[in-house]
């Protein structure tokens, strides 16, 4: 939410503890940092618990064979995870290989931030020590599934190595290049291209390990009435592993069920007698035109790069008559042209005004997303009111919700179905890690060209798209784009954005790439006139989207890394991040 994917009103910020929105608004502060995990009772508290466990587990006399090694490995992986959470937010952090006695002299307790390379090495060392002794997920006892598995630790290491190779952490981007700790040691080393090779080779190793054990992208649904609906169902299922099981794609699953659906799904009515009403759903989180435009056309290209796109800016009305879109788009009916001829991930991820949204089985639960004021998905009020629940964009987010649970029973059904498991990492991410790292290391025409395109195209093909070569070669304005390193970088970045939209990646990806300004993070979010009572009014009479939230600010001189709480920096003596 601190990126630009979700858009919400003031009520969501002040009533639902969605503090990351304030980061996107430009309201981060060193006095009381938003999203702070450094200070007291933060991650260092849990790292201390990990150290305590590792220091004393050997004193337990009645462990069964293998438990010492396995349990120690699980905690080492957990400690590595906590270290990585610090790295993502703050860059170089303070390493704690062993606990410091609380009665130690103050100078011993005042530890320096370690150089970035040392931090990465500490994380990967912990994972290397853990992985040989971790149990594969499918072999774990039911009572141990919520602890780190071999696949999860391997996937985490692949992600860590990718971040370590990325511009923010690999040499640093301005203003971090010359950052030093209090003893004058450089915290960021010079850029090292070999880090991309290390990340790429390890990603390939993990993929080979996973595929040899039956992991694959979820695909092959044939229970729906059209190929498009089958593909949409595949994409929906890729995020689910109820009770830590029944997924060929989930490689890291964490304990705990997210309640985000309560704020994403609309209430659908005002009283319990309304046929689709649910009083525990709020629908305050929408999305915006920037995200809508990120999705490809049906040809697998950005709208601006598809020479066959016939809808101009997309802000006029048009009709769909192709039966392949049955039960997705109302056929023969005026809808916004921007919503036509788009890729399956658009229809699987976004509930767009004027299109259908399956909210339970059967045709009676196939609902038209009518976001005009006074309609089922629209506002009932005659003004935007910061004191109440409102969707201020007209768009809803399907990602991470189930189309087979009726709105009325969603709360009960989803809590029963998930059984405390949330997918944290998918095989698709490993494919894109490998593609990105090999492209950065040697470009698209090196020795690993096949790996790059095989990995990238596997994700696209599951999503119902042509290969990169076919999309750009046959339909693209620049048919040679994928043969250039910069062009392929843009393709891979966009693929990552689309495939993992609303899964918590974009906030960190844009930072590690150093592309926040190019991505428009200083531009206010745009969407539609949700007070409009006709489609013409709603879509602003064809004049394009309007500003729906007035705050958006990113300062590249400070905002790529979080501030350490100023009080913490003063007491501990550590150097503060630049700009804070």
PLM-predicted stretches and their roles:
Residues 61-72, 194, 442-451:
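Structural helix-adjacent loops and short alpha-helical linkers that scaffold large soluble proteins
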Residues 324-462:
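C-terminal substrate/ligand-recognition segments
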Residues 10-90, 106-150, 315, 335-340, ...:
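Conserved, well-structured interaction surfaces
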